[in-house]
Structure formats: C-alpha cells, structure tokens
C-alpha cells in the first residue's frame, strides 16, 4: 500500500507566498523555532509586528431561531474565535487570519440575491425578505476543509430546499449555480492576483439539483446565534457539510437554475485537484496529501494539535450516500 506523508504548510500554501513569508520573518530576526510554526501562526506573528489598523466589522446581531434536536451533535464546538478567525476567503487574502483582518468594511446592508434561470418565478430578494420568509434554525455541523483540517460549527439558517421550492424551478433545471459578490473595491483579492491566489473571480459554485434539495444543504445567515461576520461569508452563504469547505460558497448574490453543469472556481483553477462533487472521502487523496485524517482546529496548542480519522461524507453517509449510488467516487471526486 502506498503511504502518504502528512501535508506540510508548503503543500497547502502557494509556494511563492510560503517562501516570501519565511524571508520576511528572518529579516525581522524571528527565531528558527518560529519559522517551524504553521504558516497561519507565522501570519499571526507578522500581524503583531505590522499593527495594521483596518475597519472592524460591527458585532453580529442576535438572531431568533429554533434548535431542533435532530441537528445537534454530541461533539464539542470549535471555539468561536477560531471559527471567526481561521478562514479561507481569498477575496480578502490568502492567510487564515486575512479575512478577519481585511473584511471588516464589507457592506451588507440592502444586500440582494438574484434568482433566475430555469424557474417559474425569477425574482430578486433582499436579505431581510429572506429572514422574514424562512424561519431560522440552528444546526451543528461538522466542517471539513480540503486542506485536512476540521471544525464543529453551530450555523443558523434555513434549508436551501425551501428557497428552491419557493422559486419553482422548471423540469429543465438539473443544477443550481451560485455566485459570490464581485466588488474589487470591497474585496481586494479580486483585483490583486497575488492577494487573491490567482483565481478567476467572481467565485462560483454549483450543486446537482438532488444535492441542493437534500435536507442537509443549508443557507446560513448566522453562526453562534448571531449574524455572520464578513469573514465567514456574510450575509448569506452555503453550507453542505458532507462536502469540502470550498464548495460552501460565501457572500452569495446570484442563484441560477440551469440544465448544464455550472462552472466551479476551484475546479476551473485545478481540475486534477478539486472535483465538481468535492465529497469528503478519506479513501480519495488530494494529489499532494492524504485525506485519511484531519487536524482538529481548537484542540491543543500550536505544537500539539489533535488529529482524527476522516469519515466518509464527513460522517453524513446515512443522509447522502444514496445520492451517489452507482457513481464511481474515485473518478467523480
């Protein structure tokens, strides 16, 4: 059996950025021990030296929601400061701390979502319409990043299926496509290819219709009982807990129903590394690291972090495995 080494920070971080960061830390006289810390910890050290002063997001507003027993997990929650401070949102930078540092000025007042394509009722809804129309509930979900780290997060939102039924897709609609806000003035990574990882923006994602209708698929508007902070995808994002995190598109402004399979940003950028389905699967490795285990964020310190086995479909096989019956999960990763 072929043995896979554990991914290093250089594997999951763009190479040029990884070595540039190390050169800067050395120039600041940072010790060799600090250079051996994870990339995100090195970013924290740099932030301490920079003392950057950027707009801070206003505190989240408390939400009213139910707490159905069916959606609780007997697992400890990831600390809130980790959920809101350790993020991938390349529109605001590549480091895990960048979104929290750079997204504070994102304007979400008057936010609207356009819904069109193969639907009976094309329409545009603002975020307040959605909050009034669809009752909210809290769901505690596992979250698994393709970079082999994980969290347990208490999202607040409503089933995507409820919005789909409201829009009344036609029989032609086989997929649901999503698009993030495109606003380079607010999202600096969209105009700076280095800061934004060289991706083509706006960020886009998609699901098969049966995936989108699964009760697990959530449109989240809050976390930890409050409205989403910008770095977590305010004011509305997708949560599909059986899929890797890059499928969970943030700051959605457009939902389109289509007959054709929609493009997906990471699949376009690196199709051999990021598939359309992106189902969590410990038996199908990323080309550069194993997916058999995951680092549990919030456990231990920087040098003593718990790892645990990754579960097929992130532990949600009972709810979603039937969606992929007869599909080769290795080829359709």
Swiss-Prot record:
Protein name: Protein-methionine-sulfoxide reductase catalytic subunit MsrP
Organism in which the protein naturally occurs: Pectobacterium carotovorum subsp. carotovorum (strain PC1)
Signal peptide coordinates: 1-43
Highest taxon, organism lineage: Bacteria
EC code: 1.8.5.-
Reaction catalysed by this enzyme: L-methionyl-[protein] + a quinone + H2O = L-methionyl-(S)-S-oxide-[protein] + a quinol; L-methionyl-[protein] + a quinone + H2O = L-methionyl-(R)-S-oxide-[protein] + a quinol
Location relative to the cell: Periplasm
Self-association state and partner proteins as the record states: Heterodimer of a catalytic subunit (MsrP) and a heme-binding subunit (MsrQ).
Alphabetized Gene3D superfamilies for the sequence: Oxidoreductase, molybdopterin-binding domain
PANTHER family: PROTEIN-METHIONINE-SULFOXIDE REDUCTASE, PROTEIN-METHIONINE-SULFOXIDE REDUCTASE CATALYTIC SUBUNIT MSRP
Recorded GO CC terms: periplasmic space
Oxidoreductase is among the record's keywords: yes
Biological role stated in the UniProt entry: Part of the MsrPQ system that repairs oxidized periplasmic proteins containing methionine sulfoxide residues (Met-O), using respiratory chain electrons. Thus protects these proteins from oxidative-stress damage caused by reactive species of oxygen and chlorine generated by the host defense mechanisms. MsrPQ is essential for the maintenance of envelope integrity under bleach stress, rescuing a wide series of structurally unrelated periplasmic proteins from methionine oxidation.
Modification after translation (UniProt): Predicted to be exported by the Tat system. The position of the signal peptide cleavage has not been experimentally proven.
């Amino acid at each position: 059996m072929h043995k896979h080494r554990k991914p290093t920070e250089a594997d999951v971080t763009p190479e040029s950025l990884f070595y540039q960061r190390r050169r800067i830390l050395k120039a600041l006289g940072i010790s060799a021990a600090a250079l051996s810390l994870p990339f995100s910890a090195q970013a924290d050290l740099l932030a301490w030296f920079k003392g950057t002063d950027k707009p801070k997001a206003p505190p989240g507003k408390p939400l009213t929601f139910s707490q159905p027993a069916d959606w609780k997990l007997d697992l400890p929650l990831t600390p809130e400061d980790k959920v809101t401070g350790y993020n991938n949102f390349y529109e605001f930078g590549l480091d895990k701390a960048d979104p929290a540092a750079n997204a504070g000025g994102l304007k979400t007042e008057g936010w609207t979502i356009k819904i069109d394509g193969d639907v009976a009722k094309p329409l545009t809804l603002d975020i307040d319409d959605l909050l009034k129309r669809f009752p909210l509930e809290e769901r505690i979900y596992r979250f698994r990043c393709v970079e082999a780290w994980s969290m347990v997060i208490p999202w607040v939102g409503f089933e995507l299926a409820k919005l789909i039924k409201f829009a009344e897709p036609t029989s032609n609609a086989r997929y649901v496509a999503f698009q993030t806000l495109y606003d380079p003035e607010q999202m600096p990574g969209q105009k700076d290819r280095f800061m934004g990882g060289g991706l083509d923006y706006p960020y886009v994602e998609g699901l098969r219709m049966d995936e989108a209708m699964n009760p697990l698929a959530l449109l989240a508007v809050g976390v930890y009982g409050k409205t989403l902070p910008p770095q977590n995808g305010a004011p509305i994002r997708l949560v599909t807990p059986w899929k890797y995190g890059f499928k969970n598109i943030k700051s959605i402004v457009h939902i389109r129903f289509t007959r054709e399979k929609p493009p997906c940003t990471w699949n376009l950028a690196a199709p051999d590394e990021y598939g359309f389905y992106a189902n969590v699967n410990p038996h199908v490795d990323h080309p550069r690291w194993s997916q058999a285990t995951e680092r549990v964020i919030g456990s231990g310190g920087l040098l003593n972090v718990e790892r645990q086995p990754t579960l097929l479909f992130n532990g949600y096989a009972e709810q979603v495995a039937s969606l992929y019956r007869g599909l080769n999960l290795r080829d359709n990763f």
